[in-house]
Amino acid sequence: MDDDGSLSIRNWGFYETMKGNLGLQLMPSVTGGHRDTKPLLPNGTFLQHHTPPHHPPHSHHPRDYGNGEPSGGMPAEPPAIHMDFVRNEAWMHPSQHQHQHQHQHQHQHQHQHQLQHQHQHQHSRELKVLNAVPVGPAPHIGHPGHAVHHHPTGFGMMPDARGAHTLQMMQPQEPPVPDEEKITPPLVEDHSVVGSKPPVKKRQQGRQPKVPKPKKPKKDATPGEDGAPKARAPRSRGPLKPVEMVINGIDFDISRIPTPVCSCTGAPQQCYRWGAGGWQSACCTTSISTYPLPMNTKRRGARIAGRKMSQGAFKKVLEKLAGEGYNLNNPIDLKTFWAKHGTNKFVTIR
């Protein structure tokens, strides 16, 4: 390895120039007549040559030749070009590169100045447009139906903007109303009363209102001599209906028979009527015999029910006594004729 780190290789880090240009003319020389032509791109990046600050634009190796031969008199080696020139077009035309680079830099500066002037002019035009009358939906300005013909160029587009900062002064237009919404439905009266109840007035006309019956006034109790109302008299029972019964072939009315008695306590006690033609004891049950019978603990205001006898059983008693020649005009003692099966618990004796 050498002192400069070139690994003893000739032209380390350099490319040898090609012998001749092989008849290629990739870039025409820039003459005075082409100074006003514009570069291929607006900013001229295609022709611009960026050179690092630590490499001069035309730096050659120390072994470059002068006057065709080096100082040693030996045949000159082909000139070597630094690798930075591979990235640009300097290796094609080394004699014109410096002049072309200066012309490009001058033309680029002129183009930037022109763009800045154009931007200022466009900004002033935008301010004028903003201060102008607002533009309605094209082509109508102001009143609808009146087209303005003295403005051939509208404020919507700037023809001289050259693709930058186009200003559109279009107001947001409302979306068009569909035809279905424009057609208003015809006014139709609502006759959907099918199945509903008729009005109250019609029902009142069909039916006559019921007249409430007048309530009978309550009779006030006639005051007595002292001014106090008289006490209600006990309700008297009506006459007994005749009950015809055939006893031993003789029609007999049992309603005329005197009330039977029970002498289980030693003193005869009248029995109570029970059911249809039956009788009930007022002093005895199957277990006790006392008068009056004790009060029922389960039913308030009622006593224990005594033994009972149905109408059929009483008829049998009458047939038996009539066969023995008993005078039925005398009260009958039912002490020995009560049923043996007990008493009815639900009979109330008052």
Swiss-Prot record:
One of its GO terms (cellular component) is nucleus. Residues 179-192 have a biased composition (Basic and acidic residues). Coiled coil: none annotated. A motif (Bipartite nuclear localization signal) lies at residues 199-219. InterPro entries: GAGA-bd_tscrpt_act. One of its GO terms (molecular function) is sequence-specific DNA binding. It comes from the Eukaryota. Pfam families: GAGA_bind. Residues 51-61, 96-122, 199-218 have a biased composition (Basic residues). Residues 43-74, 93-125, 137-241 are annotated as: Disordered. Transcriptional regulator that specifically binds to GA-rich elements (GAGA-repeats) present in regulatory sequences of genes involved in developmental processes. Positively regulates the homeotic gene BKN3. Belongs to the BBR/BPC family. This is Protein Barley B recombinant. It comes from Hordeum vulgare (Barley).
